[in-house]
Each structure stands twice: as C-alpha cells, then as structure tokens.
C-alpha cells in the first residue's frame, strides 16, 4: 500500500517543530541519525516521499546506528511491558505454545550470544513458527550477512510504523503527532512494505 497524495496526517508531521518531530520519529526508530535525516528533509509532498526518505536513511546507517536502532526493539516473544506497539507487532507469538515460546527464548539467547544484538525481524503478519524458523535459518549467517538482513528488516518495520503514524494522525487528530510528546505511535499490518526479491526470509505483510 502506497500513497502518492498528501494527507492531513502528513501535513501535521511536516508542520511539527524539530524537537517534536524527532520525538515522534524516535517512537518509530531509535536511531538518532535516521530521525535527524528524516526531520531535516521535511516537508514531504507525499507519504511515498516520506517512505523513500526512510529507505535512503536506513540504507546509510552505520554499524553503530544499526545497533542504536536495534536497542529500541525488544526480543521476539518478550514485548516491552505497557508498549502496545511491540505487543501488536509480535502478536504472532501471543498464542504460541509454551514449548514454542521456550524454544524461541533459547534461540534468541543463542543468536544474541553470536551476534551481540537482538534478533530483529519484521514480525507483523508472521506466526510464531515462522519467526522461529527465521531465527533458525539466520543464526548460521556471517555477521556481515546478518547485518544487511537486519537493515532490510528494520526498513520494513520503519515503513509500517511511518505508515501508521501518518494515517493514524489523519484518522485520530491529536493522538500520534501531538507536539512535545511524540505521540503514541501504534502499528499494525496496514503500512506499506517494500518488496525484497531474494530475501532469505519471505514476508507476508499486508
């Protein structure tokens, strides 16, 4: 799903003061470099322009920037308490069996021990089994290969969250883009996701 026309939510984001825009974007992605680049590039004529800017900023994140971004994401199966965003994105694990949750915990720990960071995947639309299979597959990657997969997955997450940010701002004025607070930024399966032909993990995003 893409949008080639401007919206009220996008207009409100474009009009935010710099500090408020950075706060809103921090709820989308914890990388300061990513948020700063998107903030200074405003105004965006269309939502597609915003998504393209996000893709470009994500592509240029350094290893340190990626680490900062990943630090804002909880492990799969352990969403942040009181955070509806991570809970909604990881709802595929909510009804998983105790055995699957335990296996995912063990795989997460093994992955983190090898790579030094959480296992990051665009969880929207995935079942618990699909996420488990993905970490099983990716744990055998080299650090360099895994870093680029993480970059792709982060880009997908950012697009979904940005889509929800601007569309929720249009549907519910005053909630996600309230100046000085950063919102709450809620996510679901309705945001636009870039296609990644040949990606080692196939997505089922709406």
Region spans (language model):
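Aromatic-anchored, charged helix-turn/loop surface patch used as a conserved interaction hotspot
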Residues: 1-111, 156-174
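C-terminal non-catalytic interaction appendages of large macromolecular assemblies
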Residues: 96-172, 206
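Intrinsically disordered, low-complexity proline-rich tandem-repeat tracts
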Residues: 173-176, 181-186, 192, 200-202
């Amino acid at each position: 799903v893409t949008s080639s026309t401007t919206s009220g939510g996008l207009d409100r984001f474009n009009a935010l003061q710099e500090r408020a825009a950075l706060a809103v974007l921090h709820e989308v992605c914890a990388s300061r470099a990513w948020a700063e680049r998107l903030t200074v590039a405003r105004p965006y004529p269309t939502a597609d322009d915003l998504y393209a800017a996000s893709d470009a900023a994500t592509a240029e994140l350094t290893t340190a920037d990626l680490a900062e971004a990943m630090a804002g994401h909880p492990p799969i199966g352990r969403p942040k308490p009181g955070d509806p965003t991570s809970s909604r994105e990881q709802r595929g694990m909510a009804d998983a069996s105790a055995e699957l949750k335990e296996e995912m915990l063990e795989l997460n720990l093994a992955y983190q021990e090898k790579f030094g960071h959480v296992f990051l995947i665009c969880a929207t639309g995935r079942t618990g089994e699909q996420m488990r299979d993905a970490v099983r597959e990716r744990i055998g990657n080299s650090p360099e290969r895994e870093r680029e997969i993480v970059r792709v997955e982060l880009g997908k997450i950012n697009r979904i969250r940005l889509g929800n940010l601007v569309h929720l701002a249009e549907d519910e004025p005053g909630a996600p883009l309230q100046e000085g607070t950063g919102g709450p930024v809620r996510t679901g399966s309705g945001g636009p996701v870039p296609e990644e032909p040949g990606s080692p993990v196939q997505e089922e995003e709406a």
